[in-house]
Every structure is written in C-alpha cells, then in structure tokens.
Design a protein with these regions (language model features):
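Transmembrane alpha-helices and adjacent helix-loop boundaries
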Residues: 1-427
C-alpha cells in the first residue's frame, strides 16, 4: 500500500510571480470593453490599498479605521501635481505621479503615525478613527487644497507623449496601474521577508516577549505604519490619475471601512488575501450596485458570514482545499462538498428572491406588477412568488442540514489523517 509523503505546499515563486505578471498583461486584452477596463483600474488601485492596509492589520495586528487618510492625502497631492504640470509650473512624467502620492502618504505617516502608534490594540483603533474624522472635517475648512464639496479635478493627459503613450485611453491607465501593482506587490512581499517584517509579526503575536528581548514595539509599529502609508499613498495617486478628480470622500471613514471589509473578506492571514478581497469587493460595489439596490445588504451578509464561519477569509478556504488536494483526499471530499454547496445556494436563492421582492415593493416602482429575477418575470404582489421563495428556502435549508453532518464528519476525518501524516513525516 502506497504511503503518503508530505511536502510543503510551494508552487514555486517564479511560477507564481510569472503567472501574476501574465495575468496583469492579458487581463486588459481579454476584458477590453470600456466598463471592464474601468473595473480593472479600480481593482488594481484597491489591491495596492488592501495590501498596504494588511501590512498593519494582518502583519502587525493594528486595526486601523483611518487608513484612507494616507491614500486620500496622497491622492490630493497627486492631483495638485497634475494641475501644476498642466500649468507648466512643474515637469514630471505622469507615470511617476503615483510616487508623489506615495511620498505624501509617507510624510503624513511620519506625522500622524508618531501619535497613533504610541498605543496598540483598541486604543490605536480609536485614535485612527478620530484621526480620519478630523481630516475629513478639515476638508471643508480648507477649500483651496481640498476643493470643498466638489473636490479637485485635473487632467492626466499632460506633457509630451512618449512612444505614443499619453494616458488618455483607459487601457494605457490600466497598464500603468498594473505596472505599479506588480512593483508594489513585490515590494510589500519583500517586506514580509525582512527582519522588520518578522519583528512586527513578533510584536503582533507576543509584544511582551518582543520587548523583553530588547525591541521597542512602538517603533516597530511606527516604522511599519510609515511604509504602509507610502504604499497607500501610491494607490491614492493612481486613483487620482484614473478618475481625474479627488474629493473629501477619499479621506473619509467610509473608504477606510471599505478597505477593512474587503481585506477581511479576502483573508488577513495570507499575503494574497487582500488581492482576492479587492476583486470581490470592487465587483460587489461597482457591478452589483448596478444590478440590485440590496447590494449593501449582500456585502454585509458576506462579511458577517466570513467573520463567523471563515475567519481566515476566502484565502483560507482556498488553501485548506488546496491542502486536501495536495494529499490526494479530494475525491473523498468532493461528493460531500458539491452537495452542501448546491443545497446552500438553493436556500440562498430563496432568501435573495424574497429580498429582491421586498426592495421592489418598497421602491419607487410599487405600481409595477412584475419584476425580473434572473431573467424570469415574477409578480411580487402575488402569493405564488412568495410561496416559491419560501419553498426554495425551506427545501434548501432542509437538504443543507441533511448534508451538513456527513460533510463535517468527512472533513474532520480527512484533516485528522493529514495532521497524522504530517506529524509522522516530521518525526
């Protein structure tokens, strides 16, 4: 009988980074419509923003409610730089404007971080919440810099074109964002391998022990925040180039909350978690918001579900399944897995149908007798649609509960075998 052999899950860094680069190159060519390019641009900037936020939360254990301060102020400095370039007062390649945002974010990280990182835990979170509200309130007090309620607009097509690149067409902006995303991702991954990256992990896990062996945890938090603010500023600079307008919303608590939600959904315990979270989050806020008025409800439910049942985020679900696949147990798991997924989706279909009908009845189109649900005309005023919704939920929930126990037993048995084999190999 063949015995299991354990090897660490390592896809090979060259393969991973090469695949990531190819994805960034070919994604704009495959999804080439105007709406798709705009969506890719927003995903790219949010990926950098999420990775920078995860330097604080995932690696340093610092829950910040004010990270938008650094990306937003970086965006304001970037848009002012574009306006200076347009007026002839400054010469700088547009491709380097994100660096202006990065250095602006770093400067404010040095200024604000010295105060906020004096404390850790809940106190740090509350200070950052107060900071973001302070900066947001200041945006209305200094209209010459923040532009008041209308914000500051600019034009990214400035200066001479180089090799036909003017950054006027959206696809050129997408590739600019992709290039910065690749560079920033490499830089932030490299940070995790440095002594500072290891030490901030130690300060997160056991600050008392880190201080006992001679390290100042406040300075570790401070230096990490400065670097995080730099990359957040770069994301803000790219956002300014993409939208050509920056407003007070860029420095608001709403944007800080958005990056927190997206990063947590993706997975704060994995480096690539924020990348997944940015894709899911931007898709929900941009595409879903056009399809349904209840998109915020769905986003909130997804966040609650992740917090309760998958604290490691989507990334942890992928890695756990990858481990099962690596050890050759997926054939044993698959029959249980697809059943529980199908029954869960069936129950959720009934819930979503009820939610959409409620929103339809409470909206401005109450007089409309019909609505479309996945392309099918239904009548929310009638009893039939509600019976179908209730039946879908009841049948799905019943089958889900029937499938849950066998799935949990199989999952536990498989993971017990994997742990036993790993311990055997380690001995």
């Amino acid at each position: 009988m063949a015995q299991l052999t354990y090897k660490p899950i390592n896809l090979g860094r060259r393969v991973v980074w090469g695949g990531f680069a190819l994805l960034l190159v070919f994604a704009p060519l495959v999804f080439s419509s105007g709406a798709s390019l705009s969506l890719l641009s927003q995903m790219g900037t949010m990926m950098i923003f999420g990775l920078s936020f995860n330097m604080l939360l995932g690696q340093g254990g610092m829950l910040s409610f004010g990270h938008a301060v650094y990306s937003g102020l970086g965006a304001f400095f970037a848009i002012h730089t574009l306006n200076l370039m347009a007026g002839g007062s400054l010469w700088l390649p547009v491709s380097l404007v994100p660096l202006v945002g990065g250095f602006a974010g770093m400067a404010f990280g040095i200024l604000f971080g010295y105060v906020t990182t004096k404390k850790a835990g809940t106190t740090f979170s509350m200070i950052t919440l107060g900071l973001v509200e302070l900066v947001f309130a200041s945006s209305l007090m200094f209209p010459s810099f923040f532009g008041g309620e209308g914000g500051i607009s600019g034009n990214r097509v400035v200066g001479a074109t180089v090799m036909g690149i003017s950054f006027g067409p959206q696809i050129q902006v997408v590739y600019l964002i992709a290039a910065w995303l690749f560079l920033c991702t490499i830089a932030m991954f490299a940070f995790t391998q440095t002594p500072l990256g290891r030490l901030i992990n130690a300060a997160r896990d056991n600050p008392e022990r880190a201080e006992f062996i001679g390290y100042d945890t406040q300075w570790l938090r401070y230096l990490t925040l400065i670097l995080s603010a730099f990359f957040a500023g770069i994301s803000g600079g790219l956002s300014a180039i993409n939208f050509e307008i920056v407003s007070a919303e860029n420095v608001s608590a709403i944007r800080s909350g958005a990056v927190l939600l997206f990063t947590f959904i993706g997975g704060i315990g994995f480096f690539f978690g924020p990348l997944i979270g940015a894709v899911v989050g931007v898709f929900l806020t941009v595409v879903f918001s056009e399809l349904t008025k209840a998109w915020q409800l769905y986003l909130g439910c997804i966040f609650i579900g992740v917090v309760m049942y998958a604290p490691g985020g989507i990334a942890s679900i992928l890695m756990l399944n990858l481990r099962v696949l690596k050890f050759g147990f997926y054939k044993q798991l698959w029959p249980r897995l697809w059943r529980i997924c199908v029954t869960f989706l069936l129950a959720m279909l009934g819930v979503v149908m009820a939610v959409e009908m409620l929103y339809h009845l409470q909206g401005d189109v109450v007089s409309a007798n019909e609505m479309r649900f996945f392309g099918i005309l239904i009548k929310p005023h009638g009893v039939t649609a509600w019976l179908v919704s209730a039946t879908l939920f009841a049948v799905g929930a019943y089958l889900f509960m029937r499938c849950k126990a066998p799935f949990v037993a199989t999952w536990g048995d498989i993971n017990a075998k994997i742990e036993a084999e790993m311990q055997r190999v380690a001995q």
